[in-house]
Amino acid sequence: MKKDYYEVLGLSRSATKDEIKKAYRKLAMQYHPDKNPDNKDAEEHFKEVNEAYEALSNDDKRRRYDQFGHAGVGSSAASGGGQYGAGASDFSDIFSAFNDMFGGGKQRGGFEDVFGGAAGAGGRRGRASGGIHGTDLKIRLKLTLEEIAHGVEKTLKIKKQIACTECNGTGSKSGATETCPTCHGSGEVRQAAKTMFGQFVNITACPTCGGEGRVVKDRCVSCYGEGIKQGEVTVKVTVPAGVQDSNYLTLRGQGNAGPRGGANGDLIVVIEEKPHEKFQRNGDDVIYHLALGFPDLVLGTKVDVPTLDGSVKLTIPPSTQPETMLRIPGHGIGHLRGSGRGDQYVRVNVFVPKEVSSHDRELLKELKNSSAISPADQNDREEKSFFEKARDIFS
């Protein structure tokens, strides 16, 4: 008896499309024949996962499955005479999902290369002529705000799968291959299942050759016939100004090497912005907090302020109020698109000392009694001025 498709993917019946796709990718990677050679249980799980995804990823099929169970799905996926039915074209969704996993969603690479794209009714997928496409490699690159502001070039050492030097990436001592004895060169395995509505054909990658159609002769002892091994390479990454945290750069062909001569995957560099001890980022602008004493705010002054380009002299106007924002043009972060840079804003606040000397305390008391700086007196004068103006208007 067939398992429930939702149980196969480990989902509830209210699962969203994204949840279905995510679960499928995880399980397909887990049970893929390349990772589980000669493992019949894994092969069976792989087939079940493919079948469940093929049904639940299609809105119409999912509706029929929810209403009628497996019989509802089989009616659209089968036809008489062993030919492909309407559901066969939906296998392109499966290979498209594999494309996302192995080739970053590109037209080339992944299972599209292995099978040559989705076949039409009664069609056949071609096998890859140059091995399986290598997987993408993702790394994180930490950058300072100064590096992000101006752009930077980094030289990185990364560990990845590289072509075996002993066999030149072929997987064979002599470089010779032979037709796969399991799939006889087709690169795929077909299993037919009869239902009350007709015959359903399930097509999967050949577990022996991984969909290539050929297997190596005289396996290389260094790479065990895979044509790849773990190595370390040096890569230069040019990061433009203005990138943000979690932005990424894609270096085509710099990822893991493909088994047995397959094309390289891509290297995906994810930007990670380091927190700055002085500046706070706001888009392409930066904010710096400056604390000044009360006399400097009242009388005005000139102070040295740090920027992403070094120190600059900033003029503080007399009677500057706390929380005032002063602008330093062109000292922010370079624009990712277009020329120019953002600005730096200096937020001015008053510095209040935790301790004062007895002499300073007396000076502050004397200053407190001055009507020029008393907030209460100032408020009274403003209110009086308002009423005086009102009286003048209506008199």
From Swiss-Prot:
GO molecular function: ATP binding; heat shock protein binding; unfolded protein binding; zinc ion binding
Stretches forming CXXCXGXG motif repeats: 164-171, 180-187, 206-213, 220-227
Annotated zinc fingers (CR-type), start-end: 151-232
Main location per the UniProt record: cytoplasm
Domain of life: Bacteria
GO BP of this protein: chaperone cofactor-dependent protein refolding; DNA replication; protein refolding; response to heat
Domain J: 4-69
Cellular component aspect of the GO annotation: cytoplasm
Subcellular location(s) of the protein: Cytoplasm
UniProt binding sites for Zn(2+) 1: 164, 167, 220, 223
Keywords: Chaperone, Cytoplasm, DNA replication, Metal-binding, Repeat, Stress response, Zinc, Zinc-finger
Cofactor: Zn(2+)
Binding, Zn(2+) 2: 180, 183, 206, 209
PROSITE patterns: DNAJ_1 (PS00636), DNAJ_2 (PS50076), ZF_CR (PS51188)
Any Pfam family matching the protein: DnaJ_C
Keyword Nucleotide-binding (UniProt): no
Record's cofactor remark: Binds 2 Zn(2+) ions per monomer.
Note on domains (UniProt): The J domain is necessary and sufficient to stimulate DnaK ATPase activity. Zinc center 1 plays an important role in the autonomous, DnaK-independent chaperone activity of DnaJ. Zinc center 2 is essential for interaction with DnaK and for DnaJ activity.
Subunit structure: Homodimer.
Function: Participates actively in the response to hyperosmotic and heat shock by preventing the aggregation of stress-denatured proteins and by disaggregating proteins, also in an autonomous, DnaK-independent fashion. Unfolded proteins bind initially to DnaJ; upon interaction with the DnaJ-bound protein, DnaK hydrolyzes its bound ATP, resulting in the formation of a stable complex. GrpE releases ADP from DnaK; ATP binding to DnaK triggers the release of the substrate protein, thus completing the reaction cycle.
The family this protein is said to belong to: Belongs to the DnaJ family.
Protein name: Chaperone protein DnaJ
Organism field: Chlorobium phaeobacteroides (strain DSM 266 / SMG 266 / 2430)
Gene: dnaJ
